[in-house]
Amino acid sequence: MATIKDIAKQAQVSPATVSRVLNYDKTLSVSDETKQRIFEVAEELNYTKHQKKTLKKMPEILLIQWYNQQEELEDLYYLSIRMGIERKAKMLGVQLSVCQLSDFPIDNMTADGIIALGKFSKREMAIIQRIALPKLFVDFDSMSYQEHSLVVDFEFGVIQALDYLVANGHYSIGILSGQEKTKDNQEIIADSRLQAFHRWQSQQEHAIDVVELVADFTVDGGYQVIKEWLKQTGSKPSALFITSDAMAIGTLKALEEANISVPMDMSIIGFNDISVAKYLSPALTTIQVPTEWMGEQSVEELLALMTQEKTITKKTMFAPKLMIRESVRTLL
């Protein structure tokens, strides 16, 4: 595993700076460019290269991004997928251009295929579908639009997380789920992991005491919600399941400020396994989503679609897995 020193050396900054950036230290004064470089180096060192032959002649792919640069820094999930896309495109010699939907070149399209990364409203989908090119939607189930998609089996990940907590004696569980809107503010996006949580809860033989909290999918979102929640009276659950590692980082900060020890006083389990999760204190137990591989696979799948005259709409689903580290305590 790469160390803080490895990241610092490649990013050309001090180990202390790396540590503070990876832990989202708000008192640190460094540029967004430096933060971006550190996060990208952390992703790069976390990546295991796969040797594949480069094709001689490849077309151009347009990547439509949902997140902007600042949002990528707040939640590394989409940064990691994007880097996987860029890495695979470079490996195969594919020309890749990147834009946000607001800059979508409808009247000046030179690409041969489109990868759309993120969540999109009906209005936004109508814009994208005006272009008669092969398309692949990543992290967005576009089957109802008759478009190919590549998604994560969030339900399976939720089951793994919650079964692990119960196996360790936790029957009082809080869930911090995320809330977000499409970029045009036309649609609220439900957190499918909260829905999966409810289905899991309904199937349990033993009663599960549940506390439900909602925040933005950011470090600060998790921090603010947990900080306010801790001010409330009453007993607290023995464990928190948090549907994104970014919110989990904010949660850890709020708990530390309240002198609540993780995992001795409260256990934490996250979701995504972003590159900084292993560097937190304690190292975060989380559900690993193969984000880099999703990015790589999206390039390969789109290239395959480009060579097919007729295709049946396909949804590819990836299974996440539990990464056991240090943030969950056994009560047995």
Set out the residue ranges of the language-model regions.
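N-terminal helix-turn-helix DNA-binding module of bacterial transcription factors
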Residues: 1-56
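Alpha-helical structural signal in soluble globular domains
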Residues: 41, 84, 88, 192-204, ...
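Periplasmic-binding protein-like
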Residues: 110-117, 174-177, 212, 233-244, ...
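Flexible loop/turn connectors
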Residues: 231-332
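Hinge/beta->alpha junction and helix N-cap segments in small-molecule ligand-binding domains
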Residues: 69-75, 100-102, 150-160, 176-227, ...
